[in-house]
Amino acid sequence: MKKFILGLFLILGAMSFAAPKFVDMAKVKNADYVIKNEREDILTMAISDDDSAIIISFSTANMSSKEISDLLKSNALHNSENFIATLDNNRAYVNEFEAQGFYSYIIVPKKEKVKNQHTYATYVSSKKISKNDLSKITNAILDEAESYIK
């Protein structure tokens, strides 16, 4: 029995250190997000309702924000998403796509809160978002994502 309990604590301890170190996992676990991918170099979490979904990722990739934005754009194109536009605002690079009646907006902040630690998000909606509304949504999503950074 003692070995079982010790093993359980070792497993739980290993799981708690499986996400990037700059992410506040206690806060993430208390949020309504569903964790989709949890490794030492990346954490991806998602939340959705009837009309939209938000996917937030934290990564330790050794790339610039622009390189990450371009890579995510390339990956989306390979997944048969139709590229619509790149929208550049003061805070983030935003790539807009359409696929199967849904619009997705890949958001990569230009400046990272922690050096060499990246945050990026995808907002998916059944409706095309106006540029003005997209700016507000981008700021809200990035504020939300950054609230999970230590």
Indicate residue ranges for each PLM-predicted region.
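Signature of long, low-cysteine stretches enriched in small and polar/charged residues
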Residues: L77-K115
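Surface-exposed amphipathic alpha-helical segments
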Residues: K29-Y33, T122-K150
